[in-house]
């Protein structure tokens, strides 16, 4: 153990770890549960910050991507609004992946990558066979 004038390096490391954990729990947005992946589409819209993120809401493992949605007025306190995007059409039936958000004339526009597996892996429905998939850039709008 390294010590300088009664100062314990190991004790300071432990204090630092606790402080980092405390700050991380306060300042890092976490989904209410299950798998969380890349943040997408951070935007300030109608008086709130909106954060979208890739999310598999059914298990704590990677799966067919959805977009979770959280809002904040101060970037510290977040309210989770649930799933914002979910696979709902042929072009994104196997996941809603990375994208962005922009505002134009009071309307929020979400752009994202939809994925469709041409051959699904029979051992894991969340994977395609032999990288055989198509992707499409998709767009939707919201006024609320």
Feature-to-residue mapping (PLM):
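Beta-rich carbohydrate-recognition and catalytic domains
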Residues: 2-144
């Amino acid at each position: 153990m390294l010590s300088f004038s009664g100062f314990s390096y190991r004790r300071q490391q432990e204090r630092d770890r606790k402080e980092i954990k405390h700050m991380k729990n306060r300042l890092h947005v976490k989904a209410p549960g299950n798998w969380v992946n890349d943040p997408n589409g951070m935007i300030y819209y109608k008086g709130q910050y909106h954060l979208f993120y890739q999310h598999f809401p059914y298990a704590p493992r990677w799966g067919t991507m959805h977009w979770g949605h959280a809002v904040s007025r101060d970037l510290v306190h977040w309210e989770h609004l649930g799933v914002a995007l979910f696979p709902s059409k042929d072009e994104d039936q196997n996941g809603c992946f990375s994208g962005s958000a922009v505002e134009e004339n009071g309307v929020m526009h979400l752009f994202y990558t939809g994925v469709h597996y041409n051959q699904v892996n029979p051992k894991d429905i969340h994977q395609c066979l032999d990288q055989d998939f198509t992707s499409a850039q998709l767009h939707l709008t919201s006024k609320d």
